[in-house]
Amino acid sequence: MKAVFFVPDYQRGYRWGTSEVELLLNDITENGKQHGQNYYLQPIVVKAIGKNNYELIDGQQRLTTLYLILSYLRKQLPSVRIRYDITYETRKETHDYLQNIDFSKKEDNIDFFFIANAFETIEGWFEMKQKNGEDLLGICINFYQQLNENVKVIWYEPEKNVSGVELFTRLNLVVSLSLTQSW
């Protein structure tokens, strides 16, 4: 059964740039070189809103980037299955764009722009590996195996009576204070 993650209107759109996308790809790869060590993603905070349906309170950037990586891998390996979907409360066209990235529409919408750039970064990352003399198909197979076998998601689901907006605000306030205090 496929999980559906619902991005509520209080969240900004997808905004990861090249450095964040490459860091995630490199972290997954480097971890794979350590012979099966698990790689734990930062927590995904969700609230159940139905059977296999979740409000995505925190972790949208990571989950979307993983979705884009899997989309790229599926282009190379048609047997790749993406076991979740991402929908948006106020940006319904973003869901469609994520399903079928059209680079000619990249400039139509800020979400499209960042999604297309992230996908291009992913393509470029795999192509660079290929230029280093490795077989693209082999690279994709190894990466997909690593992703499935050793990448773990830290899943946090608060109590049902906790408001998603409140939790999102608290999580981001803590991050904001931490960043401010580090200056």
Predicted features along the sequence, with ranges:
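Glycine- and hydrophobic-rich flexible loops that cap the catalytic core of alpha/beta enzyme folds
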Residues: 1-183
